[in-house]
Every structure is written in structure tokens, then in C-alpha cells.
């Protein structure tokens, strides 16, 4: 796609990984500020599609005790892994694709990769 866009003469082409939230926002701002035609190409396998292909799975995330219930993760993302239990935000590890977007937008840095639970005999 990038080669085609450049071949037709687009002067401002940026390729981003959409799961890198800050860099994606920077690219969008640069495209808006650019005088002329600008194209942003988001290049990443869809997390749900990757899961269906059984590609290497990323570690699921969990909401830690640092969460202050601002709910930015639920209000700003359409992630099916989020749910509310006893007035606390939770992440279903079976639905979490490990994309880490929620962790990047959490104002408390309360969303972290899930720790493996050790089973004792």
C-alpha cells in the first residue's frame, strides 16, 4: 500500500503500528498539520483475526489495585474483554488479546500484563 500511495505522488506518507497509541496520535496530528495530501497507513494484524489464526498469543492484561475507577478504558475503547464486577473494572483473560492499548490510556497505569498464578500442591 505504501508504495502505491507514494507512486501516485502523495508527499506525506506515514506508516504506524496502531497499538502504539502515542505514536499513532503524533502521526495523526502531523497529517492534520501538513499542508497538502497526507496518508496514514496502520499496519498490524487485527488482534481478533490473529487469535482466530492461533498466532503467537500476547500475554493478557489485568486491572490492578491501583485502579481508581476513572473508566477511561471502558469509555474510550470498545474492547469486549472489559466488564464490571462489584463496581470494579475487570478484564476477561480469555477475551483479552494482549494489545496493550488499555494500558497505554490508563491515567493511573493500573493495567498491567497478567501475572501467572502459581499453583501449589
For each predicted feature, which ranges?
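General beta-strand structural signal in soluble alpha/beta enzymes
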Residues: 14-17, 41-42, 113
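Glycine- and other small-residue-rich loops at beta-strand/loop junctions that grip anionic moieties
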Residues: 16-17, 65, 94
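Glycine/aspartate-rich loop-and-adjacent alpha/beta segment that forms the canonical ThDP
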Residues: 30-84, 116-117
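Conserved thiamine diphosphate
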Residues: 1-27
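Iron-sulfur cluster-binding cysteine motifs and their immediate structural context
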Residues: 68-92, 97, 101-119
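Structural motif
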Residues: 12-14, 37-40, 88
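Flexible loop/turn segments at secondary-structure boundaries
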Residues: 21-24, 47-50, 98, 113
Amino acid at each position: 500500500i505504501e508504495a502505491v500511495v507514494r507512486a501516485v505522488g502523495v508527499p506525506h506518507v506515514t506508516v504506524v503500528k496502531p497499538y502504539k497509541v502515542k505514536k499513532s496520535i503524533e502521526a495523526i496530528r502531523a497529517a492534520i498539520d501538513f499542508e497538502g495530501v497526507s496518508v496514514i497507513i496502520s499496519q498490524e494484524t487485527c488482534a481478533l483475526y490473529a487469535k482466530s489464526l492461533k498466532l503467537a498469543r500476547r500475554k493478557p492484561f489485568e486491572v490492578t489495585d491501583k485502579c481508581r475507577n476513572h473508566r477511561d478504558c471502558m469509555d474510550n475503547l470498545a474492547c469486549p474483554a472489559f466488564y464490571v464486577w462489584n463496581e470494579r473494572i475487570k478484564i476477561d483473560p480469555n477475551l483479552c488479546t494482549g494489545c496493550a492499548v488499555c494500558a497505554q490510556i490508563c491515567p493511573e497505569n493500573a493495567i498491567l500484563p497478567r501475572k501467572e498464578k502459581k499453583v501449589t500442591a
